[in-house]
Amino acid sequence: MPRVQFIDESELGPEERALIASAEQTGAPDPRVVRIMVRSAAGKAWVRCWNSVLYGGLLPHKLKEMCRIRISVAHRCGYCSTVRSHVARAEGLSEDLVHEVLNDLASPRLSARERAALEYADLFKAGDDPIDSDAVYERLRAHFSEEEIIELGMLCAQTVGVGRLVRSLNIISWEEACELNPALADQEH
């Protein structure tokens, strides 16, 4: 059971309904977390910001979703690890490719650009110091524009920070996530 309750239907206004409907349409963020976040003005602002970062911008949505899933599994968020964007699926992000993202960054199915983004996501998740390096940004510049680097960094920051909050809400436990998707149990994070 979540540690913060879902908003009751009777409390939903037009804005809250629209944010939940958007989540139902896109698949990420999952409507369950949105039903908690829309309880507050700050939560609603985050949902709007997240939708802008995840679905807007210059980077392909599929690439951003791959980074989001990799970070989510690394911090063992049952909720975030099982959520899948319908948009990314339509762009070719299959569960087979997710398996490659989680287990084999050397996979020929991943482009050099995708590997660079996923490696940056790993460094971002590891803490403050690993990304605070000229060498990291030089590697990123080989594949991304300055604008894309900012976008990728914002995605990773949102995924790491808000992901920790969402994990703590206990919408779905890691154990429940592993029951839904047994492949998660193989992750050694």
Predicted regions and their residues:
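Membrane-interacting alpha-helical segments
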Residues: Q25, K64-M66, P108-L118, I172-L180
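Mobile cap/lid helix-loop segments that border enzyme active or cofactor-binding sites
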Residues: M1-H61, S85, R89, L184-H189
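Short acidic alpha-helix initiation/capping motifs at coil-to-helix transition points
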Residues: A41-W46, R76-C80, A126-D134
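Acidic/histidine-rich alpha-helical segments that form the ligand environment
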Residues: R113-M154
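N-terminal hydrophobic signal/anchor transmembrane helix of membrane proteins
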Residues: M66-S85, H99, I150-R167
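Preference for long, well-ordered alpha-helical segments
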Residues: E146-Q187
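Helix-adjacent hinge/juxtasegments
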Residues: R76-S111
